[in-house]
Curated annotation (Swiss-Prot):
It is found in: Cytoplasm, Cytoskeleton. Undergoes a tyrosination/detyrosination cycle, the cyclic removal and re-addition of a C-terminal tyrosine residue by the enzymes tubulin tyrosine carboxypeptidase (TTCP) and tubulin tyrosine ligase (TTL), respectively. The active site is at E254. It comes from Euglena gracilis. Its EC number is 3.6.5.-. The record marks Y451 as: Involved in polymerization. One of its GO terms (molecular function) is hydrolase activity. Belongs to the tubulin family. InterPro entries: Alpha_tubulin (IPR002452), Beta-tubulin_BS (IPR013838), Tub_FtsZ_C (IPR008280), Tubulin (IPR000217), Tubulin/FtsZ-like_C (IPR037103), Tubulin/FtsZ_2-layer-sand-dom (IPR018316), Tubulin/FtsZ_GTPase_sf (IPR036525), Tubulin_C (IPR023123). Its main location: cytoplasm. The gene is TUBA. Its cofactor is Mg(2+). This is Tubulin alpha chain. Keywords: Acetylation, Cytoplasm, Cytoskeleton, GTP-binding, Hydrolase, Magnesium, Metal-binding, Microtubule, Nucleotide-binding.
């Protein structure tokens, strides 16, 4: 088997986790208590969904996941919620005191005490796997736990499981909506380590997803539940080929191989289509070509940045439902002829496609329409540098006055770490700029007409 362990950190990560596991259970027909009426071979671990669930002898299905927070309230909601019987109690770990939006508390003082316990749980889960493929880490980098403890945990995972892939689903601070004053500090400090310790990081931001909810689903005042269910659809589409059988299955390591041209340039954008409410879906065709075009719309991107301002280096299109390769090839060919969608000149093909026959599942009482087919795109575009530029600018404004820095230093962090992280991000912006530059200009001295 190719198992995957999910790690949900901090409030953001845990709440996305709730939405994801709710959706996985619906997709596989697993009841909230872990039983699965449709599973005939009890205790036999060769079903495709065993990548995400382990089976006990009694036929109960337990998620291969760890929920971790430094304060108890959010984990307690899982302990008392609908799916309380699904998880093993040891998989829900909570501390006593909060990271208080402070990266240094999550990374140095409070996080240090809990990280060994968490690694111990992860080791137990890993021992239970026959062929562990990698980790999915879910966290927000604006707060203290997701950024500080997230960094600590990813660093330790790199040491213990060096060769395994690590995919991060990272919620970045939005341009307009802010949940904490010190967000820019936390996210810059955390990104500094995401550069080294994740293989692919999918960027999400709340504001972009709010806009999608308002515009496409006609939800006037979207809640976090609306947002998380949308994110869960994306994550479910990315992992569908690991959990179901399909025509063109895509492995987790394939994302890496196809999306990451240089190790540092691994921050990717995601989009999903069709995102429409049930009323609208009734009147629309939603062919493969249509949903493919929709996935490339700047408005569909789940992070606030405009892909028209940059160039694509690569993109993965994951189709699910009633889709045949012929339609996919036709719609990809159409995309390639569009002037608005630019690829870098050193990457001529640029597309990786996956097809899975399992149609998208919707949560009962949710906002999305039940559709025959859907596509999820993750793309590596130079436009993502906009996100970093925005955060860096806010960081600079605060750091020039050394505002709030004493809270971090007081928790045992050195001030030099701020400037080191900031320089690393400046270098990252520069990297993106160079990657997007015309390659002919760079090699101006050499004779270009070699081939």
């Amino acid at each position: 088997m190719r198992e995957i362990i999910s790690i949900h950190l901090g409030q953001g990560g845990i709440q996305i986790g709730n939405a994801c596991w709710e959706l996985y259970c619906l997709e596989h027909g697993i009841q909230p208590d872990g039983s699965m009426p449709s599973d005939k071979a009890i205790g036999v671990e060769d079903d495709a969904f065993n990548t995400f669930f382990s089976e006990t002898g009694a036929g109960k299905h337990v998620p291969r996941a760890v929920f971790l927070d430094l304060e108890p309230s959010v984990v307690d909601e899982v302990r008392t919620g609908t799916y309380r019987q699904l998880f093993h109690p040891e998989q829900l770990i909570s501390g006593k005191e909060d990271a208080a939006n402070n990266y240094a508390r999550g990374h140095y003082t409070i996080g240090k005490e809990i990280v060994d316990l968490c690694l111990d749980r992860i080791r137990k889960l890993a021992d239970n796997c026959t062929g562990l493929q990698g980790f999915l880490a879910f966290h927000a980098v604006g707060g203290g736990t997701g950024s500080g403890l997230g960094r600590l945990l990813l660093e330790r995972l790199s040491v213990d499981y060096g060769k395994k892939s690590k995919l991060g689903f990272t919620i970045y601070p939005s341009p307009q909506i802010s949940t904490a004053v010190v967000e820019p500090y936390n996210s810059v400090l955390s990104t500094h380590s995401l550069l080294e310790h994740t293989d692919v990081a999918v960027m999400l931001d709340n504001e972009a997803i709010y806009d999608i909810c308002r515009r496409n689903l006609d939800i006037e005042r979207p809640t976090y539940t609306n947002l998380n269910r949308l994110i869960a659809q994306v994550i479910s589409s990315l992992t569908a080929s690991l959990r179901f059988d399909g025509a063109l299955n895509v492995d987790i390591t394939e994302f890496q191989t196809n999306l990451v041209p240089y190790p540092r340039i691994h921050f990717v954008l995601s989009s999903y289509a069709p995102i429409i409410s049930a009323e609208k879906a009734y009147h629309e065709q939603l062919s493969v070509a249509e949903i493919t075009n929709a996935a490339f719309e700047p408005a569909s991107m789940m992070a606030k940045c405009d892909p028209r301002h940059g160039k694509y280096m690569a993109c993965c299109l994951m189709y699910r439902g009633d889709v045949v390769p012929k339609d996919v090839n036709a719609s990809v060919a159409t995309i390639k002829t569009k002037r608005t969608i630019q690829f870098v000149d050193w990457c001529p093909t640029g597309f990786k496609c996956g097809i899975n026959y399992q149609p998208p599942t919707v949560v009962p009482g949710g906002d999305l329409a039940k559709v025959q087919r859907a596509v999820c795109m993750i793309s590596n575009s130079t436009a993502i540098a906009e996100v970093f530029a925005r955060i860096d600018h806010k960081f600079d404004l605060m750091y020039s006055k050394r505002a709030f820095v004493h809270w971090y230093v007081g928790e045992g962090m050195e001030e030099g770490e701020f400037s080191e992280a900031r320089e690393d991000l400046a270098a990252l912006e520069k990297d993106y700029e160079e990657v997007g530059a015309e390659s002919a200009d760079v090699e101006g001295e050499e004779d270009v007409e070699e081939y």
